[in-house]
Amino acid sequence: MNIIVVGLSHKTATVEIREKVAFAPTQMEKPLHALVSLPDITEAVIVSTCNRVEIYATTRDIAGGVARLKRFLADYHNISLETLEPHLYSYHGEAATRHVFRVASSLDSMVVGEPQILGQIKTSYGYAAEYKSSGIILNRFLHKAFSVAKRVRTETKIASSAVSVAFAAVELAKKIFGDLSDKTVMLIGAGEMCELAAKHFINTGVRGVMVTNRTFERAVKLAEEFDGKAVNYEELFDHLHKADIVLSSTGAPHFIIGPKNVEEVIRRRKMKPMFFIDIAVPRDIDPKVNDVENIYLYTVDDLNGVVATNLEQRNKEAEKAEAIVEQEIGQFFKWLSSLEVTPTIVALRSKFDEIRRAELAKTLANWKELPPDAEKRLEALTSAIMNKLLHQPTSVLKRAEQGNRNDLYIDALRNLFELETTRPEVEELGELEE
């Protein structure tokens, strides 16, 4: 069985492309069930964040599985595959494992070391577990990814020198306005990114924070944490003119702020400049807003410029993290290979031993008088012959296991000898590692 990855990220696709293939976190049941209904796709997990959309799956047919996942992404979102394919990447085997371990460890993030991606993958895995689209392989695979990320976080200082996307947004605001002590911030959304942004804005000494959210109680809760003010979502445009900086991160499927809204707001501000940061995918703010005078709109892609200057220390820590990833890849593949190889070897030996015992029993039944130790000697002789015969195929299978080339041999043996194998039980892992 092979692990495959198909997806796109901020490295291969603009926000305009990414938002077209984003999956709503509250509507994962349908696409997950559709994925595991595809031919040869046995398990699947969808990871959909601001900066990436990826599908992790298991299949016996690598080329066919990758093609089906690409077609699924295009068809599910009503996009032509010709439009989407240039932005897609795919991995299988060791490369897929390396990619997911690196993603979970934030080594592939826009901001290396940011902690949000691990939580996002855990949430994605939670949906797959809830809707039963993940199984023995992806369960173990993602728990391994979580433990790799934990090792990276505890054994390196990669997180200590990292800046999150939310922090990058604050840094961008400082570049636009300079001193933020007389500025008021409006947060649209009350999720993790807005909470992080609120912390960073408060630390820079902004004058005040307003929070609005479709669920007013969540807005109140976040606002209270920072001595801010909660605003009813329906009254957003009654209060927007009071904000100098607006950061939006909701899960809305369409624009919630357009140019006409902003034209009215800027008039009420007597043309005082406003800074909008849209870190939602799909985007919350119509890009035409940027055409309004004295309005400055930035998206998640614009944050690349803020975070492009990686510190030397972070790069050194990233090298340590990469070494951890490489070490863990080998350990995971040893387990994955044994999942197929060990039961096959056991089944092969069992089949041969069954035949040996049956034939030996027939032979002994036809001999009326035997020396006292004859049965014991014949037992040893036939066992030795069987072991000699099985030594070479067993050795080849074990060598193939180490080289990750075992599927061909396993399938051949199962077909030639009509083997029935049962995978070994894998211990159920409890709570997700923090």
UniProtKB/Swiss-Prot annotation:
Pathway: Porphyrin-containing compound metabolism; protoporphyrin-IX biosynthesis; 5-aminolevulinate from L-glutamyl-tRNA(Glu): step 1/2. GO terms for biological process: protoporphyrinogen IX biosynthetic process from glutamate. It holds the Pfam family GlutR_N. One of its GO terms (molecular function) is glutamyl-tRNA reductase activity. Its EC number is 1.2.1.70. The record marks 99 as: Important for activity. InterPro entries: 4pyrrol_synth_GluRdtase (IPR000343), 4pyrrol_synth_GluRdtase_dimer (IPR015896), 4pyrrol_synth_GluRdtase_N (IPR015895), GluRdtase_CS (IPR018214), GluRdtase_dimer_dom_sf (IPR036453), GluRdtase_N_sf (IPR036343), NAD(P)-bd_dom_sf (IPR036291), Shikm_DH/Glu-tRNA_Rdtase (IPR006151). NADP(+) binds at residues 189-194. It catalyses: (S)-4-amino-5-oxopentanoate + tRNA(Glu) + NADP(+) = L-glutamyl-tRNA(Glu) + NADPH + H(+). It is an enzyme of class 1 (oxidoreductase). Keywords: NADP, Oxidoreductase, Porphyrin biosynthesis. SUPFAM superfamilies: Glutamyl tRNA-reductase catalytic, N-terminal domain, Glutamyl tRNA-reductase dimerization domain, NAD(P)-binding Rossmann-fold domains. The active site is at residue 50. Substrate binds at residues 49-52, 109, 114-116, 120. Belongs to the glutamyl-tRNA reductase family. HAMAP family: Glu_tRNA_reductase. Possesses an unusual extended V-shaped dimeric structure with each monomer consisting of three distinct domains arranged along a curved 'spinal' alpha-helix. The N-terminal catalytic domain specifically recognizes the glutamate moiety of the substrate. The second domain is the NADPH-binding domain, and the third C-terminal domain is responsible for dimerization. Catalyzes the NADPH-dependent reduction of glutamyl-tRNA(Glu) to glutamate 1-semialdehyde (GSA). This is Glutamyl-tRNA reductase. It comes from Geotalea uraniireducens (strain Rf4).
